């Protein structure tokens, strides 16, 4: 399971280095095989171990090709999806269309989200953190059925 936010850099070839703490689990459990696609709700990328992505594909397969919203969702997620593999130095080559979608330049944030990573432009990550804090502080969490009993 992936957690924590790591500041990383993109090199001139559009590669990122996966932080060392994730490399061995990704290699041993997933053979370094990953799938990267776009997030449909934010300008970031989603990076899944290949077996986790298979679960997403199974869900996408159940969506209708005749219902416009479902078809659009499939088109976005599958149209941008790329199978990628970590090289011997723990690096991933990000396809140019994905770098463009997420507006990635040199500084980025790799954020663990249990079964996947989010990859953000560093400035956009900081802005969305502030936005998320504002939303959480303005909400009545007790009114949200799923969060009513959530405590830390």
From Swiss-Prot:
* Keywords annotated in UniProt: Cytoplasm, DNA-binding, Repeat, Transcription, Transcription regulation
Keyword Repeat in the entry? The reply is yes
Where does this polypeptide localize?
A: Cytoplasm, Nucleoid
Family under the similarity heading: Belongs to the MraZ family.
Q: Which NCBIfam families match?
A: division/cell wall cluster transcriptional repressor MraZ
Please describe the quaternary structure of this protein: Forms oligomers.
Q: Could you tell me what this protein is called? A: Transcriptional regulator MraZ
Its gene is mraZ
